[in-house]
Amino acid sequence: MTDAVQNETVQEENKLIAERRAKLDEIRKSCKANGHPNDFRRDALAGDLQKEFGEKTKEELEELNHVVAIAGRIMAKRGPFLVIQETSGRIQAYADKEVQKELKEKYQGLDIGDIIGVKGALHKSGKGDLYVNMEEYELLTKALRPLPEKFHGLTDQEMRYRQRYVDLIVNEDSRNAFVVRSKVMSAIRNFMISKQFMEVETPMMHVIPGGASARPFITHHNALDMPMYLRIAPELYLKRLVVGGFDRVFEINRNFRNEGLSPRHNPEFTMMEFYMAYADYKDLMDFTEELLSSVALEVLGSTSMPYGEDTVEFGGKYARMSMFEAIKHYNPDHAQIQALTEEDLQNRELMVSIAKSVHVEVEPFWTCGQLLEEIFGETAEPKLMQPTFITGYPADISPLARRSDDNPFFTDRFEFFIGGREVANGFSELNDAEDQDARFKAQVEAKESGDDEAMFYDADYITALEHGLPPTAGQGIGIDRLVMLLTNTHTIRDVILFPAMRPQA
C-alpha cells in the first residue's frame, strides 16, 4: 500500500469514527443507561436454533410461533435483514418498514459492528434461511470503529496478531483454530485423568531455572530482594512430587524461554508435561500413540488429516528410529555420513567436518552430542512428516535422562516428530543422584564456556534424588505445535491468541 493510499484510508476511517461518535452522543441523550444497557437477556444461540429448527419448513415454523431472544454483532445488512454473529454462528434478524423507521429515529440507523439484542418469532425465508422477526430490539453497544471490509479476514497478517479481537470477529478460520485448541486441551486433560494421573500446579517463578536447556527470563522479587526466573520447564518440581509419592502427575501450563521469534517459536508457550513411576521411555512411546490418536479422534473425528500438501496419520503404530539411523537414512548420497559408525560419533573432529559439510555453523563449545543433533536437525528433521519417534540421544545433550544400559554414550530418550517438527520430548528419568550431580556440574562448565542454554546446578533437586526417585518416565508435549498440526496452520502465531510482537515503529 502506497503512502497516499494509506493516508486516504486513514482519513476515511477517521471520518467514519467521527460519524459513529456523533450517533452515540445522540443515543446517550435519548436512551437508558447512557446508551449502554445491560438488562437484555438472550435465551437462544444461532447454532442451537439451526440444529433444532433448521429442517423445519416455513409453514411449520409459522405454526409453532416460537419466540426467541438472540444477541450478537451485526456483520452485514441485506435489505431488511441484519446478519447477526455470536459465539455459535450466524442468524438473520428481519426488520419490517416500521421497525426500520424506528431504528433510524432511535439510533440514527444501525452500523456493521454494532451489538444488538433482538426478540421475536422464528421464521424461515424463501431461500430456506432461519431468521428472527424483530418484534423487540435494543442496541446494546455502539461500535465506534468500522470493521475491515472483507469478511474473509484481515489481509495484514501482522495486524491480525496485534488486533486479535478484530481478527476473531471477521475471520472464521481463526475462530475455529482456537475452538480446536480449547478442545485439544480438554481432550488431553480428560485422557490423562482417565489414566489415573493427578493434575498439579508447580511454581512459575524459580529460584534456579531448570528442567530444560534454554535461556531464562529474569525478574526480581522485591520483598525477598532476590532475582527469580520465569520457568523454562516444570520438570524438576514434577519429579520432586514423584519422590514424594505421587506416582502419576501432569501439568498443563506456560513455559517461558528468552529466545527468538519464529514460525515455530514464541517466548511464552504451553506445554503438557507428565511423569509416571515404574515405566520407561518405551512405555512412553506406546502411551503417546494412544494419547495422540485419542485426541485427534475426539477433536476432529478422524486420526487422518491434511497438513500442507501431505496427509498425516495419528492412528496406529508410529515409526521408530535412532538419530544415528535417521541421518544415514536421509543422507544416502553423503559419503562421510554413510561411512559413520557409532564409535565415530565421539570423534569431535570428524563430527565438526560433517556438520560444516551440511552447512551447520559450528560453535566452539559444542560437544559431540550437540554436533550430532545439529546434523540431524539440518538434514533429517524437516523430512519427518509422518509421526516418528527418534531415539538414541547422546548423554551430553540429555542431562536429565537415564543412560542406556547398552551404550552409556546414549540415553533412554526420544523426541517425537510430525509435520517436520518436534512436538514432544520424553525419556526414562535419571534417578541416580551421583550421576545427576556430575551432569549438573558438566552443564555448569558448559555455561562457563559460553553455552547460555546450559543448565544451572540445583542442589535441592539432588537432595530430592538422594531420598529416592523410583524408576520413572516423563514427557513434555508442545500444545501449540500440536494444535498447529490439527488446524493445518504453519506459524505458531496462528494458534496463540496474543503472540509476542515487536513494538510498532
UniProtKB/Swiss-Prot annotation:
Cofactor(s), by name: Mg(2+)
Sequence positions that bind Mg(2+) 1: 415, 422
Protein biosynthesis recorded as keyword: yes
Disulfide bridges in this chain: none
Main location: cytoplasm
Localization per record: Cytoplasm
GO annotation, biological process: lysyl-tRNA aminoacylation
GO molecular function: ATP binding; lysine-tRNA ligase activity; magnesium ion binding; tRNA binding
Domain of life: Bacteria
Pfam families named among the record's database cross-references: tRNA-synt_2, tRNA_anti-codon
Amino acids binding Mg(2+) 2: 422
InterPro entries: Aa-tRNA-synt_II (IPR004364), aa-tRNA-synth_II (IPR006195), aa-tRNA-synth_II/BPL/LPL (IPR045864), Lys-tRNA-ligase_II (IPR002313), Lys-tRNA-ligase_II_N (IPR044136), Lys-tRNA-synth_II_C (IPR018149), NA-bd_OB-fold (IPR012340), NA-bd_OB_tRNA (IPR004365)
GO cellular component, one term: cytosol
Database matches in SUPFAM superfamilies: Class II aaRS and biotin synthetases (SSF55681), Nucleic acid-binding proteins (SSF50249)
Alphabetized UniProt keyword annotations: Aminoacyl-tRNA synthetase, ATP-binding, Cytoplasm, Ligase, Magnesium, Metal-binding, Nucleotide-binding, Protein biosynthesis
Subunit comment: Homodimer.
Family: Belongs to the class-II aminoacyl-tRNA synthetase family.
HAMAP family in UniProt: Lys_tRNA_synth_class2
Name of the protein: Lysine--tRNA ligase
Organism: Vibrio parahaemolyticus serotype O3:K6 (strain RIMD 2210633)
